[in-house]
Swiss-Prot record:
GO annotation (BP), single: DNA replication
Lineage: Bacteria, Bacillati, Bacillota, Bacilli, Bacillales
Name of the gene: yqaM
Coiled coil (residue ranges): none
InterPro entries, alphabetized: AAA+_ATPase, DnaA_dom, P-loop_NTPase
Transmembrane segments: none
Protein name as it appears in the record: Uncharacterized protein YqaM
Amino acid sequence: MAINKAVSIDTAFQTIMQELRERSARFLGTKQAVSEEKAEFDCPYCKDRGIVVYRVHKDTSWHLDEQLDLMVPDDMVSEDDFLLGKVCTPDKASEWKDTYSKQCECVRRKKIARLMAASGITEEFEKLLFGNFITDGKPDMIKDAYECAVEYYKDFQKIKGERQNSIALLGQPGSGKTHLLTAIMNNLIKKKSVHCMYFPYVEGMGDLKANFDNLEAKLDAMRKVEVLFIDDLFKPINGQPRATDWQVEQIQSVLNYRYLNHKPLLISSELTIDEILDIDEALGSRIHQMCRDYIVIIRGDRMQLNHRLGDWE
């Protein structure tokens, strides 16, 4: 009897060990399958569906998210964890039948990446932010330009459909005009998902003329984009503005459309409004009207205002 009892205990032990090995194999197999599945997707969280699903316990409280205008659970667990058995035992699964879904963060990241790619901003320009614009020890006009740019960005949502919905930073080259307007663009794209376009006047005009077959399509894109940044408008060469009749005509066609349809502009130029008015009064007056509430003209000692000549960096 003692021998039979020992055999029974040994058999039971072997059975238990076999069950444990099978459970371990199933668990490892599931983990491997999940790992392999994750590797197949750009986003392991939503599996490229754009939606993340959560399980909510039946006793969980819900509250109103005023920003989303939706009822949101106070606590939740991922669908994947629930299906892997990490949340509860099978007999308790019915307590987790409620679900809550929300857009995956990858959707916003992909949209921002598309907007950045379409904007024409280079990787180097992506680094131009308000936070790395130096104002300490700089002339008041530089500080005024910075404050104007920040204020414009903060006001953008409430003014974007108004007549005075644009900004112009004018005057001294090397004073940070492009940096500040690019910082506005970067923030509009990354934080507000606004479709923006960067148009460097000299290079852009050369491209328009060189690709005449695509001229109208490119001008149409400039007319209709949510926010257009024209950098170095009519940039002078040898003291004379680059403003041929053809160049003025193209800029006029873009600005007229944007003026009539209340579409915001960001403009930098070495010229003042008076100097732009001398080139084309209708064009200059519209720029002035659109930018009236957010305009800074930087004039003075170039050694103090031009960071390429001074010791800004």
